[in-house]
């Protein structure tokens, strides 16, 4: 079990390094001064099954209402699948875009997503998008104030994604952290710039049981070490 978790952690670290390495390579102009490398990495992902194609098709339709950039959605998918996640939690469903990226991974790992949304209209739209994508059986949408409804959760949880009211990030962290398993991940969106919550940053940066890295300039990825 311990070796398996070490392998998973190594895979996650590699997944985090790939975007940064590719970006640096493109800025340098490619190996040995050759043509720029990595342009094709900006293309949409290729589906390896009809189930994936269905999810990706719906995600492409939802993009105009997206709450996270596509590259962050792909990061969610990579981290979730690399972790072999069985239980994923999302605080801030919106219209379901990021949830679809979770679903791409979870239909491979055999996992489920519980996602919390404050607005009933957005929750209804998300449910319809999950139905169109054929993933409604692995996604549960809970409507209400997540500061209260998240108390329904029981552990262990493998990965959490927080993309809701920014002043509430610290409270969400305090509620979900005890539920996250050792080796689990907490992702927090819009963590830098004007929208950032200093209390959240201080909480993850000052906890010796956590290790945090900023990815794509706005996604804080936190590993729960123990």
List each language-model region with its residue ranges.
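N-terminal secretory signal peptides that target proteins for export/translocation
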Residues: 1-4
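N-terminal export leaders
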Residues: 6-13
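Short, linear, compositionally biased motifs with a strong N-terminal bias
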Residues: 14-16, 56
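N-terminal signal peptide c-region/cleavage motif recognized by signal peptidases
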Residues: 19-21
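A short alpha-helical cap/connector motif
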Residues: 24-161, 166-187, 191-226
